[in-house]
């Protein structure tokens, strides 16, 4: 991590002491679970995406997250306005380029958003490989590439765009183009619950709002909290249905000691 005196647990404590308002421009599938994940973690989500107000709302939020899962021309206008406002206000923002490789509209839209210099990019391995110009095996919104194959692409992407890149999957990888960490944990049931990855993007935004001066630390902390909650929930259930609500309970029950004792963060 960038700052060895900052732990994931201490950032969770700081976030809950001053819950950040996070504008989550996310897809229709993810809105409900993402809002619940944010509330369980201790943040304040706002699912505001309309072009007419997205920029104004971004200016008063602690952070912005943009997810292109259910993209349209109107949504893109709102995303662009919000990102511009976040930049002007000095607020961190996170880009989640969901299945950007799938259509020309998505590719053009992500290229436009990248020009606005996201603070953090979070995606699965296939998305990150393709975003760096490689050939991925993504199928729709699902990754068919292991995280390990995306690590080099993540470093290149971080260096090119001067951003933090997080590749999430069975094991997560986070880099600023120089330093890097792996985060182990979670549960094999997590990919069977829709929109958990999209929800993680929102949580990254919440931690970034808490520590805007150290987005690498913030990203690692968010992923560590998610992994510990997923691992705890996975030990209590037999399938994805019960996992979804157990995960929210586990996330709400996390505290500083639990994360710092159970998180498996490996600095590379």
UniProtKB/Swiss-Prot annotation:
GO terms for biological process: thiamine biosynthetic process; thiamine diphosphate biosynthetic process. ATP binds at residues 122, 168. Pfam families: HK (PF02110). Its EC number is 2.7.1.50. Gene3D superfamilies: 3.40.1190.20. Pathway: Cofactor biosynthesis; thiamine diphosphate biosynthesis; 4-methyl-5-(2-phosphoethyl)-thiazole from 5-(2-hydroxyethyl)-4-methylthiazole: step 1/1. Substrate binds at residues 47, 195. Keywords: ATP-binding, Kinase, Magnesium, Metal-binding, Nucleotide-binding, Thiamine biosynthesis, Transferase. One of its GO terms (molecular function) is hydroxyethylthiazole kinase activity. It catalyses: 5-(2-hydroxyethyl)-4-methylthiazole + ATP = 4-methyl-5-(2-phosphooxyethyl)-thiazole + ADP + H(+). Its cofactor is Mg(2+). InterPro entries: Hyethyz_kinase, Ribokinase-like. Belongs to the Thz kinase family. Catalyzes the phosphorylation of the hydroxyl group of 4-methyl-5-beta-hydroxyethylthiazole (THZ). This is Hydroxyethylthiazole kinase.
């Amino acid at each position: 991590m960038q700052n060895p005196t900052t732990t994931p647990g201490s950032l969770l404590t700081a976030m809950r002491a001053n819950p950040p308002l996070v504008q989550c421009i996310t897809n229709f599938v993810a809105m409900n679970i993402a809002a619940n994940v944010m509330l369980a973690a201790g943040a304040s989500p706002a699912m505001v995406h309309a072009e007419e107000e997205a920029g104004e709302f971004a200016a008063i939020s602690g952070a912005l997250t943009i997810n292109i899962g259910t993209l349209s021309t109107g949504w893109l206008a709102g995303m662009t306005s919000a990102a511009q406002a976040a930049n002007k206000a000095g607020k961190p923002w996170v880009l989640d380029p969901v299945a950007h490789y799938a259509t020309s509209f998505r590719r053009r839209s992500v290229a436009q958003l990248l020009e606005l210099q996201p603070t953090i990019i979070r995606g699965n391995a296939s998305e990150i490989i393709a975003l760096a110009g490689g050939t991925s095996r993504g199928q729709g919104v699902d990754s068919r590439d292991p995280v390990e194959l995306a690590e080099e692409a993540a470093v290149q992407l971080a260096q090119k765009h001067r951003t933090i890149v997080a590749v999430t999957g069975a094991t997560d990888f986070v880099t600023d183009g120089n330093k890097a960490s792996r985060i182990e944990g979670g549960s094999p049931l997590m990919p069977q619950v829709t929109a958990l990855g999209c929800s993680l993007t929102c949580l990254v935004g919440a931690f970034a709002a808490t520590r805007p001066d150290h987005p690498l630390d913030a990203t690692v902390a968010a992923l560590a909290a998610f992994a510990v909650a997923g691992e705890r929930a996975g030990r209590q259930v037999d399938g994805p249905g019960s996992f979804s609500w157990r995960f929210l309970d586990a996330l709400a029950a996390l505290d500083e000691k639990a994360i710092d004792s159970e998180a498996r963060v490996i600095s590379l």
